């Protein structure tokens, strides 16, 4: 299935597979929602059935917002934080995966 048209569940599964390949990243479930952490530091976290929040520098966040406005947003509650929200239902799966890899690089210093 094309990641640009994957269901949110398929997108979460793909993120889990990706996270498993990133050195030092572990997946866990809290209150029924997934999160992925690098040695305890947040990489990405599921917000609901169709959205994940991903760690991102402010500069990279701005780039993602301008390049993929259908995929990424910054709700008011994340405006002051180095975080961006990805829409798994309507967004570009490749862009989401790239953002997760960038978050891992940020947290791991790679």
Could you say what each language-model-derived stretch is?
Residues 1-110:
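Charge-dense, helix-prone N-terminal extensions
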């Amino acid at each position: 299935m094309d990641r640009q048209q994957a269901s949110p569940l398929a997108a979460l599964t793909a993120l889990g597979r990706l996270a498993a390949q990133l050195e030092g990243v572990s997946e866990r479930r809290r209150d029924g929602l997934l999160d992925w952490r690098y040695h305890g530091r947040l990489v990405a976290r599921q917000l609901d059935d169709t959205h994940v929040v991903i760690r991102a520098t402010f500069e990279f966040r701005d780039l993602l917002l301008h390049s993929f406005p259908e995929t990424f947003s910054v709700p008011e509650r994340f405006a002051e934080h180095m975080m961006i929200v990805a829409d798994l239902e309507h967004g570009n799966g490749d862009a989401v995966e790239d953002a997760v890899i960038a978050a891992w690089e940020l947290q791991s210093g790679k």
